[in-house]
Amino acid sequence: MASSVFNSRANNFPGLSAKASPFFGEHSSPAISLADFSGGFDGDMYSQLPSMSLPLSEYVKLITKTMTVSPPGYPNHRRLVLTDDIKRLMRRVLALMPDPETNNIFFFKLKANNVFVDLLSGKPFLHAASWTANYDVNLARMNYARVGEMFRQTIFSGAVASLPADFQQLLSLMKTNGDTASYAIQHHCSLIWRVDKKELFTRIYDFSNDILQKWNYMSYTDIMNSLHFPANWDTLIQQNPYLTMLYRGSTYYPNAGKEVLRFKRNAYIHCLQYAWDMATKQKIYDQADMGEMLETALSLVLHSFQLELDKRGLLRHIRLESLYL
């Protein structure tokens, strides 16, 4: 598979070998990206390899990884969040992993020192990684587990306990479910940019409410009954004055999972109603701030929503790829 690509690379870089391993169907590549498996090859990236790239462990030192935010309405609360720059990098590293649910490509002994980042484009690529085209469920699971360990140790030096709860759930998912939850991992809510979180939630909500509920009511009901959400979510909402105004604008039944989702949807859609102080003509918050307020009160609800859809093979139908470019 793609042997001509590997041979041409060996010719371009005499110091690198690209010969097949003694085992049928297994190969070694000096530098590969997901494009290799569809016959593509970005020559510019690899021509920069000797001098214009850094190992992942060095590149992350150039990036601000976290920042602290104070969601409006929570004067004494500060949240540590991931920066968009580090989210972009982790999304791109994940994009190097072929989808084990649709592709039979798997890597052997994937380590942090296999991952380099092009300094001009900021795109990561794999260097000297071995792969096989034979399906192996253990390798599928192991690939994502090892990438998760890269995130944990190489990027955050093991200090993940203070990081956002949804990101910790992503790491847990990568450790145990890489063979079955690849789409949920690649498009996880913890890696969405702050400004896109509303779009992510509303796409998932609208698919579930407008399509799935009519198409397969049993699956819809099963998902709603399986959602994890704070038992006192309505009380948590009313600890924030801006969320309280939105909560009081409708009637909600606190014991139903779908009501939590309905509140989040309404809060996103109508959040700008109370975003300005009419007396001072000053903006109080924007849609990204609303996302932080909702995450403070309703942590892990979106993670649970994504996961329950993915368990049933439904998350793919929403086509979230455009939000994770």
Which residue stretches match the model-derived regions?
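Long, polar low-complexity intrinsically disordered regions
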Residues: F6-F13, A20
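Generic preference for well-ordered alpha-helical elements
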Residues: D42, S53, T83-L94, R141-Y144, ...
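Catalytic-loop of the protein kinase fold
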Residues: R88-L119
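Phosphate/adenylate-binding glycine loop and adjacent helical scaffold
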Residues: C189
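Regulatory extensions appended to serine/threonine kinase catalytic cores
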Residues: K197-L325
